[in-house]
From Swiss-Prot:
Membrane-side (Intravirion) residue stretches: 1-6
Statement: the UniProt record of this protein carries the keyword Amino-acid biosynthesis: no
Cofactor(s) listed in the protein's UniProt record: Ca(2+)
Disulfide bonds: none
Transmembrane segments: 7-35
Subunit structure as annotated in this protein's UniProt entry: Homotetramer.
EC assignment: 3.2.1.18
Coiled-coil parts of chain: none
Chief place where the protein resides: virion
Protein name: Neuraminidase
Protein role: Catalyzes the removal of terminal sialic acid residues from viral and cellular glycoconjugates. Cleaves off the terminal sialic acids on the glycosylated HA during virus budding to facilitate virus release. Additionally helps virus spread through the circulation by further removing sialic acids from the cell surface. These cleavages prevent self-aggregation and ensure the efficient spread of the progeny virus from cell to cell. Otherwise, infection would be limited to one round of replication.
Length: 103
């Protein structure tokens, strides 16, 4: 296999893996959105008819609404700390040759 074929093979493999990864991500996103909207649906419950002979019918109401209104008049004034990191000089001193050596 010549070098050009190796480059094409490696890049094609990388592109294939990235496309598969993108498809898995889109499927995950679609499932999350679909399941999120499915939770909000309430089951259809029919009202019991008057002609039923069973007198122990239980009606469950799933449409409950709670309204809360919070009113606060609190103003917090916080002084910001004057912290400045000077990035024009190194953050730590290098005392070894290992970092500067090239292999």
């Amino acid at each position: 296999m010549n070098p050009n074929q190796k480059i094409i093979c490696i890049s094609a493999t990388g592109m294939t893996l990235s496309v598969v990864s993108q498809l898995i991500g889109l499927a995950n996103l679609g499932l999350n959105i679909g399941l999120h909207f499915k939770v909000g649906e309430t089951p259809e419950i029919g009202t019991p008819s008057v002609n039923e002979t069973n007198s122990t019918t239980t009606i469950i109401n799933y449409n409950t609404q709670n309204n809360f209104t919070n009113v606060t008049n609190i103003v917090l004034i916080k002084e910001e700390d004057e912290m400045f990191t000077n990035l024009s000089k190194p953050l730590c001193e290098v005392n070894s040759w290992h970092i500067l050596s090239r292999t």
